[in-house]
């Protein structure tokens, strides 16, 4: 089938990224074995068999070649959901997003209207002494609240220690699950997570088991980590119809010199860079300096928007999940293979009962399927 590659007038409209999905296809729990989730493999659109659906994530091994570089995001999801008490005893919920200043942190609040400036909050736990918090302001961009924590809660390390005592894993609201909190503490975390700072999982990485990673390495495939602390920029719903000037909330990214040097070497050969998840894509593409026309190591906040019309510099292939309608992640994947083709593949995935979203199945976008770079 011939698909329109890029139409700026249509592809920059949010409505063009909507699709229908039966709620029964939203995964409430992951596959029992990580690498046995189903896998749709997307191939060159000119081929008669331009995609495969009878595969599993473990079959990614056969798709990759010796010398390829697989990039994983090693961020770790914090127990960033806090239940706090107002002065009248009413419970409200906070989602800790990021540090703002000193010991002040930006948090999403639910219900937000209850949290007025200068109000006191009480953080309780049966395992520790109560902690007093104060609302110091309202963030115009997110609608969140600036919350003043004790003075010693002034970096990610100290905040993560507090959250380990008082917090819960922030499972997305569309995951309807009767499982205990301890289940999600394991299943909503990649097996290689080691850098606390995320408030949502880099979900493509949930498909990678230790044995699959070991088999990749045995085949001569390099596996290297970057860090992108998944935050509001990844999961915030897009609230504007015109996408031509779309902006995303910043997220912390760290890509080492070692990874950058390997990418530079690969770009001089026929080897490929395969990203595990859209967060890895954003991190790697943020390494490209248009001023220097080269890749550079970074450790900073980034707000890169990838949408149709974007020309990829670093990434050649992608393992990803099936994403929410009208999401920034859907825009990113559309930039790789075209919006029309992606939505057609999603339609086929629904007919074949693939499972969607965070705990769902996976899609491998092969290098041959990419639009011309």
From Swiss-Prot:
Pathway: tRNA modification; tRNA-queuosine biosynthesis. The keyword Lipid metabolism does not apply. Its main location: cytoplasm. Keywords: Cytoplasm, Queuosine biosynthesis, S-adenosyl-L-methionine, Transferase. It catalyses: 7-aminomethyl-7-carbaguanosine(34) in tRNA + S-adenosyl-L-methionine = epoxyqueuosine(34) in tRNA + adenine + L-methionine + 2 H(+). One of its GO terms (molecular function) is S-adenosylmethionine:tRNA ribosyltransferase-isomerase activity. HAMAP family: QueA. Belongs to the QueA family. Transfers and isomerizes the ribose moiety from AdoMet to the 7-aminomethyl group of 7-deazaguanine (preQ1-tRNA) to give epoxyqueuosine (oQ-tRNA). This is S-adenosylmethionine:tRNA ribosyltransferase-isomerase. It comes from Prochlorococcus marinus (strain MIT 9515).
């Amino acid at each position: 089938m011939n698909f329109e590659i890029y139409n700026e007038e249509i592809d920059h409209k949010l409505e063009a990224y909507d699709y229908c999905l039966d709620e029964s296809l939203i995964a409430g729990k992951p596959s029992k074995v990580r690498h046995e989730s189903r896998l749709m493999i997307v191939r060159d659109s000119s081929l008669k068999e331009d995609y495969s659906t009878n595969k599993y994530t473990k079959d990614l091994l056969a798709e990759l070649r010796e010398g390829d570089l697989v990039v994983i995001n090693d961020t770790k999801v914090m127990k960033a959901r806090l239940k706090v008490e107002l002065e009248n005893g009413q419970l409200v919920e906070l989602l800790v997003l990021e540090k703002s200043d000193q010991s002040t942190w930006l948090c999403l609040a639910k219900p937000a209207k209850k949290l007025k400036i200068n109000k006191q909050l009480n953080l309780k736990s049966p395992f520790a002494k109560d902690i007093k918090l104060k609302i110091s302001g309202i963030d115009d961009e997110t609608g969140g609240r600036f919350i003043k924590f004790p003075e010693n809660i002034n970096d990610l390390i100290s905040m993560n220690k507090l959250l380990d005592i008082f917090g819960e894993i922030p499972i997305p609201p569309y995951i309807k699950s009767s499982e205990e909190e301890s289940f999600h503490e394991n299943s909503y975390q990649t097996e290689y997570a080691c850098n606390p700072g995320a408030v949502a999982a880099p979900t493509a990485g949930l498909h990678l088991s230790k044995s699959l990673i070991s088999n990749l390495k045995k085949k001569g495939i390099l596996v290297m980590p970057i860090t992108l602390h998944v935050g509001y920029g990844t999961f915030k719903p897009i609230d504007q119809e015109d996408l031509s000037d779309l902006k995303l909330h910043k997220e912390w990214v760290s890509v080492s010199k070692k990874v950058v040097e390997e990418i530079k070497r690969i770009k001089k050969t026929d080897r490929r860079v395969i990203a595990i998840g859209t967060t890895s894509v954003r991190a790697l593409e943020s390494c490209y300096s248009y001023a220097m026309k080269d890749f550079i190591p970074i450790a900073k906040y980034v707000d890169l928007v990838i949408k149709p019309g974007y020309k990829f510099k670093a990434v050649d292939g992608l393992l990803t999940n099936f994403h929410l309608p009208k999401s920034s992640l859907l825009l990113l994947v559309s930039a790789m293979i075209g919006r029309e083709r992606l939505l057609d593949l999603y339609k086929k995935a629904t007919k074949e009962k693939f499972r969607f979203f965070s705990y769902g199945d996976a899609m491998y976008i092969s290098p041959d399927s990419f639009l011309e770079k």
